[in-house]
Amino acid sequence: MEDSSLSSGVDVDKGFAIAFVVLLFLFLIVMIFRCAKLVKNPYKASSTTTEPSLS
């Protein structure tokens, strides 16, 4: 009985680690796409951020 509870605890920890890594990869992919948009068209990206302060 105690062995099964110990192994399930290890599986929960492994699940949290895998979920954390997956979330990190998703965040990395989102940042890559945002940076690619900025590199592709920097003037449009900068004009949308500075537009409210100019008006």
Swiss-Prot record:
One Pfam family hit: Cortexin
Keyword terms, alphabetized: Membrane, Transmembrane, Transmembrane helix
Keyword Membrane listed: yes
Principal location: membrane
Transmembrane helix recorded as keyword: yes
Record-linked InterPro entries: Cortexin
GO cellular component annotations of the record: membrane
Membrane topology: Single-pass membrane protein
Bilayer-crossing regions: 16-36
Subcellular location: Membrane
PANTHER family named among the record's database cross-references: CORTEXIN DOMAIN CONTAINING 2, CORTEXIN-1-RELATED
Record's protein name: Cortexin domain containing 2
